[in-house]
Amino acid sequence: MQPTLAPAPHPSMQTSAQDHADQVLHDQLLAAHQHLSHPQQARPPPPPPQPPHMQPTTPVARDQNNIDPAISGGAMLAGPQTPQPDLSGQESPKTYGKRPLSTSKRAAQNRAAQRAFRQRKEAHIRDLEGKVKAYETMGEAIKALQAENYQLREYIINLQSRLLDTQGEVPELPGNIDLSQPRGDIPVPAPPTSGTSTSAVPVPPPTAPQQPQPAQNQASAPNDDMNSLNRIAVAGLGMRKPPTEEANYLGNSFQQQARRVRPDDGQPDASELTLPKQEPTHGLPLIS
């Protein structure tokens, strides 16, 4: 009994297996290209594993060629179906986000913004110019007020000087001077010439000293009064004369007052009295 040989494979089955292999290779190349061009995007899911009878392997193809088409049925005639990758989830990067504006619309917006900026700048410049003019007028007004103030100050100083001239205030008198009481002429006797001349004069006779005693008593009292008046005058003037000037002043006033003194009737004047002279023992001339 001879073994039966399997019929030759149908040419349509060979072409379908070759097409399936080409399709799988094309899918792998497409996936590799997408991975290189868009590394950030998620990888597409790999195709589901094919059943062993659909894998394009050489021994399987030979086995399939040896299978009777009546036994395999219409499954082999239909050919393998490869699942198509779902590309709906992948979005183009160009369409992501907002819609890009057109060039003409963007240029119009830029022109409008520049126009608004120029208007604001011109308004601000006009405002600053107005403020500068106001400051200039204010500075001129301040200068005029300062000049007027200086003129008024000079006028006030002149008025004060004239007021002081017209008032003529007199300084107050010291407390120890009273000008309300009348002051009469007080006779002042002449002072003695010197100590040497008085010591050399001898004692007059007993009758002569009794006559000039009233005159000497009268001369001592005016001398005290004159000294007190001189002290009052010096205190009122606020100054004191030197001792030499004061002695000369007292001597002159004493001589003038002595001339005015008139002795009683029947009594000789003090200037008319003559005293006997005696020569000194030392032999020097006397100085009167």
Swiss-Prot record:
Keywords: DNA-binding, Nucleus, Transcription, Transcription regulation. Residues 100-163 form the bZIP domain. Residues 84-93 have a biased composition (Polar residues). SUPFAM superfamilies: Leucine zipper domain (SSF57959). Residues 1-10, 42-54, 202-212 have a biased composition (Pro residues). Residues 1-121, 172-226, 242-288 are annotated as: Disordered. Residues 26-41, 106-116, 213-222 have a biased composition (Low complexity). GO terms for molecular function: DNA-binding transcription activator activity, RNA polymerase II-specific; transcription cis-regulatory region binding. Residues 128-159 are annotated as: Leucine-zipper. Residues 101-124 are annotated as: Basic motif. It is found in: Nucleus. GO terms for cellular component: RNA polymerase II transcription regulator complex. Putative transcription factor. Belongs to the bZIP family. PANTHER family: TRANSCRIPTION FACTOR KAPC-RELATED. This is Putative transcription factor kapC. It comes from Aspergillus clavatus (strain ATCC 1007 / CBS 513.65 / DSM 816 / NCTC 3887 / NRRL 1 / QM 1276 / 107). The gene is kapC.
